[in-house]
């Protein structure tokens, strides 16, 4: 009969020891973490370095929502502030957000940001700028995207510029896309083909040589191209 009390006493004792050991390990592992000290450090860092990138992005979104419902003059002043922010911002994620925000406004300052972002030192921002101009359109869009394709050192940026030229569906882009067919990189050639399909409204397949022939005389041989496209749709 003595065995039962022994077991009932040993269980809570061992359980209590385990909890004590776990607590001591937990406290030892978290000795360097103190929520109050962390808050104080965050406050000091914010005072010294400013808001974190995520906070700056959040505040920018909140401010833009308010400004959209305000007067034209308020929007002009806001986008002028965005120019200053763009020039001072060191984080490319935040610059991308500034760019996307500016693209929602029709002011000279907003246009300046969208144009300047095409030459941003960060590849990600330049790609976003191509997206912006693909949606923004306008008289300058083809030339700006063409220049980015022809001059950028990064393949991903060049490919995005070609893609956005297709999204514009502007026939002024055909000469640029035709030159892209001569690029030594197959990825560039096939991106040019995809964009030519959108700009021309035709589907001549994926043969680069066929598109080269078409691009040499887009307005000629209309009947022949139409017949070829008809067979392609059937088969």
Show where each model-derived region lies.
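Short inter-helical turns and helix N-cap capping residues of alpha-solenoid HEAT/ARM repeat scaffolds
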Residues: 51-52, 90-91, 121-122, 153-154, ...
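Amphipathic alpha-helical scaffolding segments comprising HEAT/armadillo-like alpha-solenoid repeats
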Residues: 33-47, 69-87, 107-119, 138-151, ...
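Core register positions within helices of long alpha-helical scaffolds
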Residues: 62, 101-104, 132, 139, ...
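Terminal, low-structured helical/coil segments at or just beyond the last alpha-helical repeat
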Residues: 198-235
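HEAT-repeat alpha-solenoid elements in large eukaryotic scaffold proteins
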Residues: 53-65
């Amino acid at each position: 009969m003595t065995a039962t009390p022994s077991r009932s006493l040993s269980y809570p004792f061992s359980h209590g020891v385990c909890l004590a050991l776990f607590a001591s390990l937990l406290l030892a592992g978290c000795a360097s973490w103190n929520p109050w000290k962390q808050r104080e450090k965050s406050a000091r860092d914010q005072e010294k370095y400013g808001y974190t990138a995520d906070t700056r992005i959040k505040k920018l979104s909140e401010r833009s929502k308010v400004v959209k419902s305000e007067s034209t003059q308020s929007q002009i002043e806001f986008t002028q502030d965005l120019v200053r922010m763009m020039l001072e911002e060191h984080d490319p994620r935040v610059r991308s957000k500034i760019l996307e925000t500016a693209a929602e406004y029709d002011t000279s300052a907003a246009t300046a940001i969208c144009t300047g972002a095409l030459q941003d030192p960060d590849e990600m921002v330049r790609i976003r700028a191509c997206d912006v101009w693909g949606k923004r359109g306008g008289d300058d869009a083809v030339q700006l995207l063409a220049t980015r394709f022809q001059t950028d050192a990064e393949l991903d940026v060049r490919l995005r510029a070609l893609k956005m030229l297709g999204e514009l569906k502007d026939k002024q882009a055909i000469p640029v896309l035709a030159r892209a067919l001569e690029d030594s990189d197959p990825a560039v050639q096939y991106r040019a083909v995809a964009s030519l399909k959108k700009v021309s409204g035709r589907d001549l397949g994926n043969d680069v040589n066929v598109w080269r022939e078409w691009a040499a005389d887009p307005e000629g041989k209309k009947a022949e191209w139409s017949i070829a496209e008809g067979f392609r749709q059937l088969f």
